[in-house]
């Protein structure tokens, strides 16, 4: 998408693309994982608020908030400290800062964007909606969800990463067909 905004490509294909800032899916992934462990909703919400605050502070170059005075269980406080250590790495600090949305109006080439409805790594609704709202409206744009597939476009039951290795399908045939058809229609 960034190259498309710089007018360096004839078309762009986004597969399970993250359009919103990296912080948003990380908070959501944590929310899902913690909820799945059976933690109380209040604890999950408190942890996710703290995590979002830390990501915002990192993006703004401010000190990271501490979990010491929170009511979080000790295991979550340790987990939070591990995440704070990772935030010191160039990759993660850049990942949470990247937000493609401001570039979308500059993209004039055709865009095909596909996201799976069972993708728990990149929320399809949030990211496809950001594309719909931000792109300049090229008539060749196709922005759609693919029903029943995970982040790597396999038909799945839950979308959990642990499920990937159990699925024989490499990539959904409908996804490959959609890509081929879309490119063929660009002529």
Residue ranges with predicted function:
Residues 1-13, 20:
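Conserved hydrolase catalytic core segment
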Residues 7-8, 135-140:
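Short helix-capping segments at alpha-helix termini
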Residues 11-13, 112-114, 144:
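Hydrophobic/aromatic beta-strand patches that form the interior of the parallel beta-sheet core
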Residues 107, 113-115, 119:
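Short beta-strand/loop motif that positions the catalytic acidic residue
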Residues 120-129:
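Conserved alpha/beta-hydrolase "acid-adjacent" motif
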Residues 138, 142, 149-153, 157-187:
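Catalytic active-site module of serine/aspartate enzymes centered on a nucleophile-bearing elbow/loop
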């Amino acid at each position: 998408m960034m190259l498309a905004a710089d007018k360096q490509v004839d078309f762009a294909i986004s597969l399970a693309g993250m359009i919103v800032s990296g912080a948003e899916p990380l908070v959501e992934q944590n929310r899902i994982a913690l909820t799945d462990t059976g933690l109380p909703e209040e604890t999950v919400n408190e942890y996710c608020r703290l995590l979002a605050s830390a990501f915002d502070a990192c993006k703004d170059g401010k000190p990271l908030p501490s979990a010491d005075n929170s009511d979080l269980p000790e295991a979550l406080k340790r987990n939070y400290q591990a995440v704070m250590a990772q935030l010191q790495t160039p990759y993660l600090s850049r990942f949470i800062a990247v937000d493609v949305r401001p570039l979308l109006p500059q993209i004039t080439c055709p865009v095909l964007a596909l996201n799976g409805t069972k993708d728990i790594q990149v929320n399809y609704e949030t990211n496809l909606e950001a594309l719909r709202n931000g792109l300049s409206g090229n008539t060749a744009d196709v922005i759609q969800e693919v029903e029943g597939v995970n982040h790597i476009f396999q038909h799945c039951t839950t979308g959990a990463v642990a499920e990937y290795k159990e699925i024989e399908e490499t990539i959904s045939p409908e996804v490959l067909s959609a890509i081929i058809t879309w490119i063929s229609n660009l002529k």
